[in-house]
Regions:
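A short hydrophobic/small-residue beta-strand
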Residues: 29, 187-188, 262
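Short structural boundary motif marking the start of a folded domain
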Residues: 2-4, 131, 300
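C-terminal beta-strand of the catalytic ATP-binding
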Residues: 60, 304-308
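N-terminal auxiliary segments of SAM/dcSAM-dependent transferases
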Residues: 2-127
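S-adenosylmethionine
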Residues: 159, 193-305
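Conserved SAM/SAH cofactor-binding pocket of Class I
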Residues: 139-226
Length: 310
């Protein structure tokens, strides 16, 4: 079975109308893509940014209804494109596939620093004797493929984590917290604003047999836990974005013991100095680090040690 796709390019002000018209016409799926090259970084809660020009793609099951025969689909495409003032539109066919398998085929094991591997749960570990972090990459952000995650994983693999308490703030899939436990940490407290991330973290901890040493919270739950358990962290990991990292600087100072270590990621080069300025009163920072390859060199990592108590 094949599916028909209708693509149209329109300004973001027309996207809502395009979605409504596609839905009314019987689309089984609608996808929004950037029509140009305008990056959008992860939004804050409640924000739903869009690109200035958007390609809206609707997928239709034209095999299930004889009314799609002949020129009906072409006429529908032209009508909707006209109503939303699309700058262009086009039609394509999409062959049916086992989409679950198709998605899974993009993930392969990743070797990080030292002896740490990230292994999708449906694949065998390339080196059974290594430290293998088994991951379901589909649950939340944090697969090991993104440079920001690998920067933190490589940093963790270089630390002595034995018997350490680690706080992973903005835990996503839980990959950093689970890695810390596999590398010897005593306990991880993982925090995220997204309930799906909290669930993903717990599930990935269970996949790796470390769920008895990892607690995952929404922020309000974490605050309540801290009230009853006011212990300070030996290590804080935060792979989020520059703006929240800057805002969290005083909180992380309060959570981290003197002499404790912190690693921050999710920064592009032109944001790094602002984050340095926010943390310098609290932390002695190392030189920013980035990978040398062209694809990932714009992502930077900051790390340091808490040495003051302002």
């Amino acid at each position: 079975m094949s599916w028909q796709q209708l693509h149209l390019q329109c300004p973001k002000s027309a996207v809502e109308l395009a979605e409504a018209l596609f839905d009314e016409a019987g689309a089984v799926s609608i996808l929004l893509e950037d029509a140009g090259d305008e990056p959008l970084f992860e939004p804050m809660p409640g924000e739903e940014p869009l690109w200035r020009d958007v390609v809206v793609t609707a997928i239709f099951d034209t095999n299930s209804d004889d009314s799609w025969a002949g020129t009906h689909f072409e006429n529908l495409a032209a009508k909707i494109a006209s109503e939303v003032n699309a700058t262009r539109f086009w039609l394509t066919s999409l062959d049916d596939k086992d989409w679950t398998r198709e998605w899974m085929s993009y993930y392969q094991p990743i070797q990080c620093a030292g002896n740490l591997w990230i292994v999708p749960e449906w694949l065998p570990a390339p080196d059974p004797a290594a430290i293998n972090l088994i991951l379901d990459p589909g649950l939340a952000f944090g697969t090991g493929y993104h440079a920001t995650t690998r920067l933190c994983l490589d940093w963790l693999a270089a630390q002595e984590l034995s018997d350490k308490l680690v706080i992973d703030y903005g835990c996503g899939s839980g990959i950093l917290g689970v890695a810390a436990l596999l590398l010897g940490a005593r306990q991880v407290l993982a925090v995220d604003i997204d309930p799906q991330a909290v669930l993903a973290t717990r599930q990935n901890a269970a996949l790796n047999g470390v769920d008895d040493r990892l607690l995952a919270f929404l922020p309000a739950e974490f605050d309540a836990y801290r009230t009853q358990n006011p212990q300070l962290a030996d290590v804080i990991t935060a792979n989020i974005l520059a703006k929240p990292l800057i805002g969290f600087a005083p909180l992380f100072h309060d959570l981290l013991k003197t002499g404790g270590l912190i690693v921050l990621a999710g920064l592009i080069k032109n944001q790094t100095q602002a984050v340095i300025d926010a943390y310098s009163p609290y932390v002695t920072l190392d030189t920013p680090f980035c990978y040398a390859d062209a694809q990932d060199c714009h992502w930077q990592r900051l790390s340091g040690i808490k040495s003051t108590n302002p």
